[in-house]
Structure formats: C-alpha cells, structure tokens
From Swiss-Prot:
Alphabetical keyword list: Cytoplasm, mRNA transport, Nucleus, Protein transport, Repeat, Transport
Segments annotated as HEAT repeats: 12-39, 44-82, 93-126, 132-169, 177-207, 220-247, 259-286, 302-406, 414-442, 454-481, 499-532, 540-573, 581-619, 627-677, 690-721, 729-764, 772-807, 815-848, 857-888
Annotated segments matching region Disordered: 333-381
Protein name (record): Importin subunit beta-2
Primary gene name: kap104
Importin N-terminal domain location: 34-122
Subunit: Interacts with Ran; interacts specifically with the GTP-bound form of Ran (GTP-Ran), protecting it from GTP hydrolysis and nucleotide exchange. Interacts with nucleoporins.
GO MF: GTP binding; nuclear import signal receptor activity; nuclear localization sequence binding
InterPro entries: ARM-like, ARM-type_fold, Importin_beta
Keyword Calcium: no
Length: 910
C-alpha cells in the first residue's frame, strides 16, 4: 500500500461510528439492528483502517465507542485469514497508527491498543513487524508515565507469548540484547507499575534459559534482592516468581544465598497479599525438586511446617468462592461445572497375579506408566475442587506432600505436635486443615504414621458425621490416602475394627446429600477398591446397592465419578460380579443411562468405558445384553468413520470427536472378552467387517484411536480369529511403522506389539514373511535404553511368540537379543503370555543349540526362578537342562549358585 496510501472517507467514518454507538444502546431493537450492520460491515475491505481511526484518532467520541471499535479491530485481526507477506499490507495503516494509542490519556484505550499490537504479533510473528520492538522500547524512555505504562502493556504480553521468538537473531541483531539491560534498569523505576512490568518481562526469559539474560544474571539477581521488600505487592510477587524460576533452571545461583532466600520465602509465604504468598509458596514445591538444596532445609523445617499448615486453613475468600454448604444433591449442575469428557483408551499390559482382574492389565502402576509417557501429569489437587483455582491452600498442601516425601521421619516428628493441636481445635477450619495435612503426608510419612493409624482411624471415621460438608469432604480424601493400611490388615479382628467401618463410612459418603461430599466419597471409595481388590467380594451386595442408589441421586457431574467407581470395582473384583443378584443391581442403572444419552453425546464416553470393564468382569453374565450393546456401539463406530470421511471432502460437515472411535472400539473389545469364542456370530453381521474398520482406525492420525484399534485387533486374534484372518497381512503392513524408534506414541506402539504377538500364535507358519521385519524392529526396541518397561515386556513376549511356530527364522538372530530378553522376561509375572514366550524361546534354542555356549547361565537362572510353568514348558525346560549337562559334561557351564542348583534339582531332577 506504500504506492497507494489509504484515503479515509469521512462519511464512512461517521456512519460506522454511529453504528458502533447504536450497538451499545440499551434499546434492544436499536442494538440488534446495529449489530446486524456490523456483521455486514465485515465485507468492507478497509474496515480495519476505519476501526483503527476510531480507536486512535476519534478523541471527540466517547471512550466506550472508541474502545468498542478497538475490540472489533482486535477480533477482526485475531480471526483474519490474511497470509504473511503481501497479504499483510492491508494492516499497514493499523500497524503505523495503533502504536500512538499507547500514549492515550485513557487507560482503557492504552490497554486495547496494546492488545491489538500483541494480537498481530502472536498471529503472524515478530518478523512481520520488526520495527515495533524498537518503537516500544523507545517509548519506555518517555517522560510521561502513561506512555511508559502503555508500552509495557504491549511488551509484557509480547514477552509472555513470544519469548522463544525474541531469543534469536533478526537481521543480525538479537532484540533481547538491548531489551534485557533496559528492563533491569527499569526494574528500579520510581513507578511501581513500571517496576512490576519490567520484572515480569525479565522472568519470561529465565524460564527459557535465555543467554541474553544469563549475560546479566548477577545484575538481575542483585536487582531482585534490592526489590525484595518493595512497597508494591505486585513487585514482591514478581521477585518471588523470579527466585522460584531461578531455583528451577539455575540452582547454582540460588545456592550461595540459600539461607537468606529461605528466610525471605518464609516471610513472604505469610504475606498479607494472597498473590505474594502463593508465589512464595511455590518455592517450597520447587526446592523439593533440587535434592542438594532441599537437604539444606533441615534447620528451617520447624518454621516451614507450621507455616504450611497455616496456609492450608481455608481463607474467608476461599469459603466465599466455595459458596454455601447446604444439602444440594437435588440442585441441577450448571453446564460450566461439568468438565469436557475425553476417552482414556486401553493399554495392553502383561498379566501379573496382582492388580485388576481383566485382560487390560496387571496393575494400575503399569497403565499409569504408559499414560505418563504419553501425557503430562495432573497437578496435586487435594479435594479436586474444579470450582477453585490453584491457591495458597492447595499449594501449601502440595508443598507439604513433596517435602514429606523428602524428609520423611524428620518432618513427621516436627509436624506431629502441630497436627495434634489442629485436629483437636474447636475451629472447624483449623481442624479441617489438620485432616488435609495428615492426608498430604501420607505418601512420604506412611511408615512412621502406621503406629498412629489405629488411633486416628476411629477419629477420622467420626468426622464423617461432621455437620460441615467441607470436613466430611477432606476426611474422605485423607481416608482414601490411608486406605491401603486398612485393606492390608491380616487379622479378622482388625479388619472388623478398621476396614469394615471404613467401607461403611465411605459408602455413606457416596450417597451424602452434599455434592462435594459425594464426589470426595466416591473418589475415595474408588481408591479403596484398588487397594482392597478381591477383599471386597463379601461386601458386594451393600456396595452395589449403594452405587445403584447413587445413580438415582447424583447430578450429571458426579455421575462421571460414579462411572469410574463402578469401572474400578469391575476391574478389581472381576468375575465375582457374575451373579444374578449383582448383575441386576449393576446393569439396571447403566442401561437407564444408556437409553437416555443420544448417539452423538460425549457423555457416552465414560459410560462406554465403564460398560467395557463391566462386560469383561461379567463374562457370560453379560450375554443377555451383548447383542443390543454391540449393535448400538457398532452403529456409532461406523457412523463416526463415515462422518470423518465426509468431512474431509465437505467443509460444511463437522468433524466428529474421535473419542467416539476410541470408546466404541474399546467397548467392542470388552464385549469380545466377555463372550469369548461365542462372539463370532455377533461380529459376522458387521457391515463393513470389523477387520476393515480396524484397518482404517489403525491408520488414524490420532494415536489414541490407533491404540484402541490394536487392542481390539489383539482381542479378535485371541477369541475370534476367523473374523480377522482375511485382513492380517494388510494390518501387519500398517503395524510396522508403530514399532519404529522413536516410538511416537508409546501406548499405541505397545498395543501394536502386543497384538503382533497374539497374531503370531494364530497365523502359525503363515506369519513367516513378517518374522524378519518384525524382529528387526523389536530387537531395536529391546536394546533401547530409553524404552518404557511395559513396552519392553510386550516386546520380549512377542519375540518369544514369533518362535512358537517359526523358530528357525528367529534362531540366527539369538545372539543379538538374548541378554536383554532374559533381563526383561524374568520380571514379567507368571501367566500364559510368559509361558508361551518361553515355549517359543525353547523352540528357538532347539534350532540353535550352539547358543547354549553363551546364554546357558542366564537361561538356568530364569528357569530356576520360574515357579509354575505349564506342563509343556516344564518338559521343554527339563530336556534343555538335561541336554546341556550331556553336551557340556556336567553343570559347571551353568555358572549357578548352590541355591539355584538346588532349585533346579528339586524341580527338574537334573
């Protein structure tokens, strides 16, 4: 536009100003007419120029009209379809003019002008507007404080959103090289707003470890120390933030002054300003991640602990945000209180003797390990208050949690007198904080707490009768944290004294009349289910009666937690639920929900996940419900795939949530596991065939869809191979990239590896052409030091299974993988998967007996540790052991200890 400068048409400006004015009218008819005109005005090519003109130049208009024009401008820029390069020339007038808005006497205009600037930069990058940074930095030298504040309103947002982009060269110069020294200088400005903003900007570059900041890090630290007692709480907050950030990325700079910094943070965590206190409290969380520095906190623990306890007491503001504590079970949830639903996806993990009694895995730890590889951890949240932001109470509890994990008994000795004082307080808020503190130290101080639990348990159970819902809520959480102790009691007398009352108490809380208590009770009960497992079987009738009643009583939000409790129960007690009395109690409320939710409602996700676990647990007890469940599930699965395909060619069609694929695939898996080989007639009706659908889902761009597709594939191989056989070669082609290092999504790769092993058992000799490409990838994963433990277990099992029918193809490669294979396989729990893997390995050895010369000691050790092999495997072990004695003239080549030799002699007579 340089050759054709924009010419303003006064009449258009006047008319647009009038329309904006009318859009703010209290008269709804006038307002709606104006809003319609503004919608049509979006077609005007130079609309943004007119809006800029009204925002910046039309000082004769009211601030409300100018600010409305600015907001329209910002939104237009945010959703603009302009491309970088020549397409951005239409913003030239806006870019050259909006800067002046930062000098406007009206704070609102300055703020909106800054928002427009930062929106342009965040949308297209600093490189498309390089001159803006020198202009903004120059404005910081203005004698007018309003101009400086205006410049910083833009700079703070730019530094926050674009720190990484700023930390590189533009045309041979690095912006931060001149920005950071100036920010450090301005951090001592007489205006507290300028000091606050300067520090805020500097803090953004600590986190990204900018070398431009590190060049001035000592000066930066000196500045922080100088501002530590600033009169402005916002400055003090940013000082605390700077020290916490430095603790994370440059602990070497914190260490020399640690004592002074600890004293400062002790003081600041008790600051009357909650924002300062919260930022300072983050220090105690951060220092626990630095063992060398945390070990120096010993002399300060007697100050830190009571300070954190005080921070855990509900403030008046906390209670105000929480609202009333009346019985509210019959009050309908607001839409904004309900979290969006997302599918979890199932991971196939090796079956051990502990943990969930389902095909889905051996223990929660294994499943959690896979999830940790694929996603971020959630924050510590002591009572899961979705209605409250991260605050001093939660931060204090989290800090106590991590510090107790580091200091253990030392911290327990310090906190016990304070806990006694809190728990016996007549102030319910102090008492409640004491209960929270006991829960917070559960993980770190469990060993030391055990001696006090017989006394504490009855006290906590009595608090479940408190008139204060918040006390009942936190007591549920804390009891959940210590439920393992009650679940592991051996004597029947102790179980009747502690475990049964705990079970009864939590079940009462599950059906409490307060929604927050229901939520906490249900969550704590789900934890108890995990800890107690099969020990709950004698109590299934009262458990299911309560859960069924809860389905009738709960509003929408808590029903989601209830699904999780039912799912966990099914996972941990398994086929014990397959009883007519239990099935009716369990299935009736689930089918009621099933009938109420439409096919396109995301509220189906948790219901489908729950039903999948219930189906697996009920086994043939689920048969009466299988046909109807499968028909609807398959319909949703097929329709979702159709809509995804249609949306690729038709932009008017909304792309459906792929979680519909994840949950339907998982529910079909559950039905297959429930019915076993009896499922084939049901699946045979599928149109298109399930094999084709798995093939499509196995190539999906969303890894969770691939993860569930491979889980279903493995289940079909196990129970109804005839339905999947025609598609095996095509599926194996798509499976190979999932096993290529680096594994882009661990859970999807894990399930692909597991399903390949299941397929190998079914295909037999027809697997031959796939053995080499699979083995190449599996050996690479097996030898990778960074591989996930669960993945490695499935790799070892699948390699072994490749040898069941095709040992001659695996045998030549034995030397490449035997060592890590033995190391991994001996950690796998004894089950059919491990047994089949070892049978395959024995076949491989039979094809390459020379390998005994280098692997015999490891083989002998694994055999000695294998307690209950199948009869077939025991026979194979015996023959190899006997053969090795004959081949090497005795047992010396075993290099075994006397204990191992005795074990082999006892088991195999060799």
């Amino acid at each position: 536009m340089g050759d054709n400068p924009w010419v303003l048409q006064e009449q258009v400006l006047v008319e647009l100003s009038e329309v904006i004015k009318n859009s703010l009218s209290e008269n709804s008819q006038t307002r709606n007419a104006a809003l319609n005109l503004l919608e049509k005005a979006k077609d005007i090519p130079d609309l943004n120029n007119y809006l800029t003109c009204i925002l910046i130049n039309a000082t004769e208009l009211s601030v409300s009209i100018r600010s409305a024009a600015g907001l329209l401008l910002k939104n237009n820029v945010r959703v603009s379809s302009l491309e970088s390069g020549s397409g951005l020339q239409s913003l030239d007038y806006t870019k050259s003019t909006v800067i002046r808005g930062l000098c406007d006497p009206e704070q609102l205009i300055r703020g909106i002008s800054g928002n427009v600037i930062t929106t342009i930069i965040s949308r297209w990058g600093i490189s498309t507007w390089p001159e803006v940074l020198p202009q903004l930095m120059e404005m910081l030298s203005s004698p007018a404080s309003t101009t400086q504040e205006g410049a910083f309103s833009a700079l703070t947002k730019i530094c926050e959103d674009s720190a990484q982009e700023l930390d590189r060269d533009f045309n041979g110069t690095r912006p931060l090289d001149f920005m950071i020294p100036r920010f450090i200088e301005l951090a001592r400005h007489e205006n507290p707003k300028i000091r606050t903003d300067a520090l805020f900007c500097l803090n953004q570059f600590v986190l990204i470890q900018s070398q431009s900041l590190y060049a001035h890090i000592d000066t930066f630290l000196e500045t922080c120390y100088a501002l530590a007692t600033d009169v402005s709480p916002n400055v003090r907050k940013n000082v605390c933030q700077a020290l916490v950030y430095l603790l994370d990325v440059r602990p070497d700079k914190i260490a020399p002054s640690l004592g002074s910094i600890v004293e400062y943070m002790l003081y600041s965590t008790q600051d009357s300003d909650q924002n300062v206190a919260l930022e300072a409290c983050e220090f105690w969380l951060a220092i626990a991640e630095q063992p060398d520095l945390c070990s120096a906190l010993g002399p300060y623990l007697d100050k830190i602990v009571p300070m954190l306890l005080q921070g855990m007491v509900y403030s008046d503001m906390d209670l105000l945000l929480l609202g009333n504590d009346a019985d509210d079970y019959d009050v309908e949830d607001r839409e904004e209180d309900i979290r969006p639903q997302h599918a979890k996806g199932k991971s196939r993990i090796t079956l051990n003797t502990q943990g969930p009694i389902t095909q889905q895995g051996s223990s929660n730890a294994d499943a959690d390990e896979l999830e940790d590889e694929d996603e971020d951890d959630d924050e510590f949240d002591e009572d899961d208050d979705a209605f409250m932001d991260w605050n001093l109470r939660k931060c204090s509890a989290a800090a106590l949690d991590v510090l107790s994990s580091f200091w253990k008994q030392r911290l327990l000795e310090i906190i016990l007198p304070h806990l006694k004082q809190s728990l016996t307080s007549e102030d319910w808020k102090v008492q409640e904080a004491g209960v929270l503190a006991v829960g917070a130290i559960a993980e770190g101080c469990m060993d030391g707490m055990v001696q006090y639990l017989p006394e504490l348990y009855p006290y906590f159970l009595s608090l479940l009768d408190s008139k204060k819902p918040l006390v009942r809520t936190i007591t549920c959480w804390t009891l959940g944290r210590y439920s393992k102790w009650a679940s592991c009691l051996e004597s029947e007398e102790d179980r009747q004294k502690y475990f049964v009352p705990l079970l009864q108490g939590l079940l009462r809380m599950v059906v409490d009349n307060n929604k927050k208590v229901q939520e906490a009770g249900c969550s704590a009960f789900a934890i108890l289910e995990e800890q107690a497992g099969p020990s709950l079987v004698p109590y299934l009738e009262p458990i299911l009666t309560n859960l069924a009643f809860a389905f009738q009583k709960y509003q929408r939000k808590n029903v989601l937690i209830l699904y999780d409790a039912v799912q966990t129960l099914a996972d941990y007690v398994g086929s014990a639920l397959n009883d007519k009395r239990y099935i009716e109690l369990l299935i009736t409320p689930l089918l009621q929900k099933w009938s109420m939710i439409p096919d396109d409602d995301p509220n189906l996700f948790p219901l489908f996940e729950c039903l999948s676990s219930v189906a697996v647990a009920l086994r043939d007890g689920f048969a009466p419900f299988a046909a109807e469940t499968y028909a609807r599930t398959f319909r949703i699965l097929r329709n979702t795939l159709y809509l995804i395909t249609t949306a690729q060619n038709d932009p008017t069609v909304d792309v459906p949530d792929r979680d519909f694929l994840v949950t339907t695939l998982d529910l079909v898996s559950g039905i297959i596991q429930a019915l076993g080989s009896q499922v084939s007639p049901l699946l045979a009706q599928a149109d298109p065939p399930l094999g084709q659908i798995i093939g499509i889902c196995a190539k999906d761009e969303v890894p969770e869809v691939r993860q569930s597709a491979y889980a279903l594939l493995g289940d079909m191989c196990m129970y109804c191979f005839d339905q999947i056989r025609p598609y095996c070669d095509a599926l194996l082609v798509d499976m190979l990239p999932q096993m290529q290092l680096p594994l882009l999504h661990v859970s999807a790769s894990n399930n692909a590896i597991w399903s390949a092993g299941e397929m190998a058992l079914q295909l037999g000799k027809d697997m031959q052409q796939w053995v080499k490409p699979l083995l190449e990838r599996l050996i690479c994963i097996l030898k990778s030091k960074k591989s996930n433990t669960t993945v490695l277990e499935n790799v070892a099992i699948t390699i072994g299974r490749l040898g069941v029918y095709n040992p001659e193809l695996v045998a030549p490669h034995l030397e490449l993988f035997y060592q890590p294979w033995f190391e991994i396989i001996k950690t796998v729990g004894e089950n059919e998967e491990k047994d089949s893997a070892f049978r395959g390995f024995c076949n491989i050895l039979a094809c390459n007996p020379q390998a005994l010369s280098y692997l015999l000691p490891m083989f002998v050790l694994c055999v000695a540790e294998y307690e209950n092999p199948s009869a077939e495997l025991r026979d194979m072990f015996q023959k190899i052991l006997q053969g090795s004695v004959e081949l090497f003239n005795g047992k010396a080549s075993w290099q075994a200890s006397p204990e191992v030799l005795a074990q082999i002699q006892a088991q195999y007579g060799v």
